[in-house]
UniProtKB/Swiss-Prot annotation:
Ranges in coiled-coil conformation: none
GO molecular function, one term: oxidoreductase activity, acting on NAD(P)H, quinone or similar compound as acceptor
GO annotation terms (biological process): respiratory electron transport chain; sodium ion transport
Subunit field text: Composed of six subunits; NqrA, NqrB, NqrC, NqrD, NqrE and NqrF.
GO cellular component, one term: Gram-negative-bacterium-type cell wall
Enzyme class: translocase
Function: NQR complex catalyzes the reduction of ubiquinone-1 to ubiquinol by two successive reactions, coupled with the transport of Na(+) ions from the cytoplasm to the periplasm. NqrA to NqrE are probably involved in the second step, the conversion of ubisemiquinone to ubiquinol.
Name the UniProt record assigns to this protein: Na(+)-translocating NADH-quinone reductase subunit E
Catalysed reactions listed for this entry: a ubiquinone + n Na(+)(in) + NADH + H(+) = a ubiquinol + n Na(+)(out) + NAD(+)
Subcellular location: Cell inner membrane
Amino acid sequence: MTESYLTIFIRAVFVENMALNFFLGMCTFLAISKKVETAFGLGLTVTALLAIATPLNNLIYTYILRENALIDGVDLSFLDFITFIGVLAALVQILEMVLERFLPSLHHTLGAFLPLLTIHCAIFGATIFMVQREYTFTESFVYGTGCGLGWMLAIISMAGLREKMKYSNIPKGLQGLGIVFMTAGLMSLGFMSFSGIRL
């Protein structure tokens, strides 16, 4: 029995959130979540990459890399990681040019983190999970979009909490990343409550 698109989407956003369930993409999650505006921009960027890269990699895997896809008896699946990274690198370069042209302030704010999206583990993880679950092209698009929106929800929530924490009296030993890690852990516990949902 195949899952409905709504089930795949809700699972990707809430139940199997890339940042708060699998802890993927934590480098940018922690570094860019200081301001809601910046977190929103990065969240949109990651969502766009996931919505494009996951189904694109699905097509490449299904029609080229999978065993017997091109020729009977030929299995090119050992090339999947390097191929997926190549696709991500090309998409990130295109996205970087678009941001530099149309949103220069966001491009400047993201700075060094933009090229790192090529090997962003949440984006790469979504592609690997898509292959393992044998999603179709449309399911891959829904899953990639859901993963991106879930990651965006998590980073915006963290940024909002971090903005509020600026005005809090935090013990000296927990200031900085200490309280951020604790907050991420508590957010993760909150998202674990969705794991009981049967869709």
